[in-house]
Amino acid sequence: GLNSAQVLKPGSPLSHQDKIKTGKNGFIALMYLDDKTVVKMLGNSDLTIMGDRSGNKINKSLDIKYGRIAANVKPQKGKEFRISTPTSVASVKGTEFAIQSDPSSGDSFTLIEGLIEVTNSVTGESTQVQEGETAISTPDGSLDVAETTSDDLDGFEEASMEPPTQELRFEVEDENGNIKEILIKFN
């Protein structure tokens, strides 16, 4: 929403068309509050987030200039979640995946769970990518799908690490003298 660059702090709200960049050792986790879809940006990444309201639904998209992104997209139930890069466009239904995008060499889309459709923007060729597969889309127009190897996920280890959850528990007494336990979980 702001016109000038600023450092994001945990819990910072983001708006339609906000641009986000991470530095060399940067890491950011974003969450769409309507459906709890999580997007994780690793170091040296640049993207623009978009969320277009259509009635009571939000059509989401990420415009990735370059970088490494991991996401867990919840089933969209009549909404759309699109990812675009300089080389490709992907339509996501509800899935967990990792993307590595470089404008000069192209994109890799690695599916951990679910299904996406990837289209090479140069040729318009499309293919479906399933769990355990990686699609490679290049600026010369090629689009290939192969079985995922450990190399395809190299560098994404930090994206899969969930922060440890802390818990606070305390008891309160309501107006009728009943004891209730309150549990607060936080990272």
Give residue spans per PLM region.
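N-terminal "first-domain core" detector
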Residues: 2-4, 16
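C-terminal interaction modules
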Residues: 4-10, 23, 29-38, 42, ...
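A short, solvent-exposed beta-strand micro-motif common in secreted/extracellular proteins
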Residues: 18-24
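Glycine- and small/acidic-residue-enriched microsegments that form turns, hinges, and capping elements
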Residues: 24-27, 66-69, 77, 87, ...
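Contiguous beta-sheet cores, especially beta-hairpins with glycine/small-residue-rich turns
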Residues: 27, 31-76, 93
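Short conserved beta-strand and strand-loop elements enriched in small hydrophobics
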Residues: 30, 81-84
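Extended, compositionally simple hydrophobic/Ser/Thr-rich segments
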Residues: 71-73, 81-82, 90, 99
